Amino acid sequence: MSVMASDKACAPVRASRPFPKQKLRELVLQALYALEIDPEGEDSLVSLLMTEASVSKKNAAYALMFCRAIRANQPDLDALLDATIRTTTLARLTIIERNILRMMLFEHQQNQDCCPVPVAILIAETTRLIKKFSYSEGSSLILAVLGSIFDHPAPALDAPLEPTSMCG
């Protein structure tokens, strides 16, 4: 049976696939890294993410929205991290390690009310991001810090993200 051209025009259009959370976390981490290196570079960040990570403008802008929210809460996040880290200081960690901690802590705190992400998923994602962007030796400290924080109720953030959050 042959399909006529007019039949193809009536075929249902597939909705685009949702942006995977793993990819979103990678983009947010890369954006946080870029802004820590060049704090004035936010204007060119969307185009940089589009080019380097091969993502749409919409997804790059979405990642930048999370990056801005994390940076808005950075003093509170860093204070909690500084109070938890015992063997070193937050400043002595690599840029990637600091930003992985900030991002995962933010996601944990941000999503408590709407759709909490299980701690096991956050720990697994932390491990994956460390393996991909850092070195495995640093993972034990990062995981210990997050584990210690996740064992206690999450404090409220001053500048929460819009209701869309990372819930999708």
Curated annotation (Swiss-Prot):
GO BP annotation list: DNA-templated transcription termination; transcription antitermination
One cellular component (GO) term of this entry: cytosol
One term of GO molecular function: RNA binding
Keywords: RNA-binding, Transcription, Transcription antitermination, Transcription regulation
UniProt entry tagged with the keyword Nucleotidyltransferase: no
Xref: InterPro entries: NusB-like_sf (IPR035926), NusB_fam (IPR011605), NusB_RsmB_TIM44 (IPR006027)
Pfam families xrefs: NusB (PF01029)
Protein's UniProt keywords contain Transcription: yes
Role of this protein: Involved in transcription antitermination. Required for transcription of ribosomal RNA (rRNA) genes. Binds specifically to the boxA antiterminator sequence of the ribosomal RNA (rrn) operons.
Family statement drawn from the similarity comment of this UniProt entry: Belongs to the NusB family.
PANTHER family tied to this protein: ANTITERMINATION NUSB DOMAIN-CONTAINING PROTEIN, N UTILIZATION SUBSTANCE PROTEIN B-RELATED
HAMAP family, sorted: NusB (MF_00073)
Protein name, as recorded: Transcription antitermination protein NusB
Provenance organism: Chlamydia trachomatis serovar A (strain ATCC VR-571B / DSM 19440 / HAR-13)
